[in-house]
Regions:
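Feature recognizes metal-dependent phosphohydrolase scaffolds
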Residues: 1-651
């Protein structure tokens, strides 16, 4: 009966045998097309300019297509010139005009070259899919130019006439821009962001803006992303963490200019409370140098003020949730105010800062009324920010803690493990959970923070978002503790150490990795774990490819401060119909440099995994869905033919 009801619904879309049969033929043809190109990025950390460029060049995929089309028929500088036009069409056009090169001959040559590139990048898709990607204003013209027309005898004259008309009527600039954007879109079929869009970079909000308009993507949440999700949900400790790190990295512009969140409540409080305090331990890590000025002095006071608020809020939260197993992060009550020391793990350390006017050491985690007012006002700004709302909605709609896609397991951090290679049981919700079950339950509660109608469930969900940010058992964080307190207040650097989860030592063990695959229902020789979070030390010879190619770590350091540590500016992964290509990127110089020189950011192919045969749509997850659709349509035709359902022929 259920099957009949389903077929009745399907019959509204395909009311006749002919319409169902036509769709089966269309779907069957799609199965035999080459699979679309998947693009994997991780740990963007707000570095918008580098991120935007990698999106535009498809991690070298655009240049690869130009090479495929033109081979040795163009010089390298000509190919680079064409590539930079495709990446930045409006800016490159203006540059060419300023040079006096934009005559009809240049336009004609450029348009032909763009058409040639567009023909090859569109060849792996159905006409319908390409048509939908085309700009509406030039859809017909582009389709004419990139489609083979066997009925046209003098093809050169036919295409010449179209190109000449585009130039003569003054539409060449707009056409070049639209063609370039179409090429960018068709080069990458689907984008995977494996966590940490947010962090210290100056452009997290711009990254989110660009993802809002991206044609096809999924996101695996990183610990920095869930921190922002928690802040929007109204979790006070998450808000304090974001404000603190924004001050630490001289990055208030994202909050104030990007999201319109006013820091004035914190400014007034810090100026009054820490007026005579130099706040020397709360320096600002600016990219523009460490010059001490009035603005920096104020930022340091704000930095200390919000840090103390954060430690109080986190202490309250940890006490409320003993199941988080984070009591070693409650350190305010371990301070001996008279001696100016703090005791951690039984050892006493001198404090680098001893001035705490807002801490009552008889009740150290209680906020003063002024601190309560500051965090309440900040919270009001976060939860009522419409732009942040749209960005967090995107994270909720397109995001998850993990994803299985085309035999690849994608997650940001780790699978919590024991020393013996078994999955670590974690009890957060009254039962022991590990591996996939832990991920699934954590995601359910994270979503409850936004969608539950039960206020207690929403509160628990909000708190789980904070736990995911820095919890010792958080699969997103993957370290035994976050030593924020120690880094501010203790000189002994041995206390700053954060021990990585055992997973990061065991992901070279094939038996362990195969066990992870089995838990997530992944089979076959071409299975991979793809994750980020832990920067790969490229210059020290560390490889991002682990476990004989089964594990690929693609955090190579998009974030500028990590460039010295990793030696590069990030890894990106391409998975096309020929296999996997892992690329290491040199730091992105600037848009202006790319336009003027034509030179792209330097990329080095680190590893490849070539498929024994070309991978078709039929070999992918989408292919499985298409086969299911074909089966349903065949059942519908059968129901029409045996009289179970009646065709709805239109007169």
């Amino acid at each position: 009966m259920e099957k009949i009801r389903f077929l009745e619904c399907l019959s509204k879309q395909y009311p006749t045998i002919d319409s169902a049969a036509t769709e089966i033929i269309n779907l069957q043809s799609i199965l035999n097309l080459p699979k679309g190109t998947e693009h994997f990025l991780s740990d963007i950390h707000g570095e918008y300019k580098a991120f935007a460029h990698v999106l535009r060049n498809g991690s070298g995929a655009v240049m690869k297509k130009i090479d495929d089309v033109f081979g040795d028929t163009l010089f390298e500088d000509q190919k680079e010139d064409l590539a930079s036009l495709i990446y930045y069409p409006s800016e490159k056009l203006q540059y060419v005009k300023n040079q006096g090169r934009a005559d009809s001959s240049w336009y004609r040559t450029t348009l032909y070259r763009l058409v040639s590139v567009c023909q090859i990048v569109s060849s792996k898709y159905t006409r319908s899919k390409v048509r939908k990607a085309m700009p509406e204003n030039f859809r017909y013209v582009i389709e004419e130019l990139i489609t083979e027309k066997k009925e046209v005898l003098n093809k050169k004259a036919y295409y010449d006439e179209i190109i000449n008309t585009i130039i003569e009527i003054g539409c060449a600039d707009e056409f070049i821009v639209e063609m370039s954007n179409l090429i960018q879109r068709l080069v990458i079929d689907h984008l995977h962001i494996i966590g940490d869009i947010y962090d210290r970079g100056y452009g997290s909000h711009f990254v989110m803006d660009s993802l809002m308009n991206y044609h096809s993507l999924d996101i695996q949440w990183g610990n920095h992303d869930v921190l922002w999700m928690g802040a929007f949900a109204g979790q006070h400790a998450c808000i304090a963490n974001i404000v603190r790190t924004s001050l630490l990295y001289d990055n208030l512009s994202v909050l104030e200019n990007g999201y319109g969140i006013s820091m004035m409540p914190l400014v007034l409080f810090a100026m009054e409370t820490y007026a005579d305090d130099p706040c020397a331990q709360f320096t600002i890590r600016s990219r523009h140098g460490s010059e001490m000025n009035t603005q920096t002095v104020l930022a340091m006071k704000m930095h200390k003020a919000i840090t103390i608020i954060q430690f109080k809020l986190e202490g309250q939260l940890i006490a409320k949730h003993p199941e988080y197993n984070m009591d070693n992060r409650r350190l305010l009550d371990k301070i001996d105010a008279d001696k100016g020391t703090v005791t951690i793990d039984g050892k006493e350390y001198p404090m680098l800062d001893r001035y705490f006017p807002t801490i009552d050491f008889n009740n150290p985690y209680e906020l003063t009324s002024e601190e309560q007012s500051v965090i309440a006002k900040l919270c009001n700004s976060f939860v009522n920010c419409s732009k942040l709302k749209s960005h967090i909605n995107l994270l909720l709609q397109k995001g998850s803690l993990y994803k299985v896609c085309n035999n690849n397991l994608l997650f940001h951090g780790c699978i919590p493990m024991n020393e013996d290679g078994s999955f670590r049981n974690i009890n957060l919700f009254g039962e022991d959970l590990c591996g996939k079950e832990l991920y699934d339950e954590l995601e359910r509660w994270a979503r409850k923070a936004f969608f539950s109608v039960n206020e207690e469930e929403k509160r628990v969900g909000r708190d789980i978002l904070w736990f995911l940010w820095n919890g010792a058992d958080s699969p997103l964080y993957g370290r035994d503790k976050m030593t924020t307190f120690e880094r501010y207040f203790i000189a002994d650097e041995s206390t700053h150490k954060e021990i990585k989860d055992v997973y990061y030592r065991l992901f070279n063990d094939e038996e362990v990795v195969d066990k992870i695959f089995k838990m997530f229902g992944i089979k076959g020789d071409n299975a991979h774990i793809i994750n980020g979070h832990v920067p790969i030390h490229h210059t020290e010879g560390e490889s991002p490819v682990k476990c004989n190619g089964k594990v690929i770590i693609i955090d190579g350091g998009f974030s500028q401060p990590y460039h010295k540590v990793t030696g590069i500016a990030g890894y990106t992964l391409i998975y096309n119909s020929y296999g996997l290509m892992l690329t290491a990127h040199e730091p992105f110089k600037s848009v202006d440099y790319t336009i003027r020189s034509g030179r792209d950011m330097q990329t080095n192919q680190v590893a490849t995994e070539v498929s024994q045969k070309r991978i078709l749509v039929g070999d992918t997850d989408n292919g499985k869905k298409i086969r299911e659709n074909i089966k349903d349509l065949k059942d519908l035709i059968k129901a029409y033919r045996n009289g179970t359902l009646r065709q709805n022929q239109k007169n």
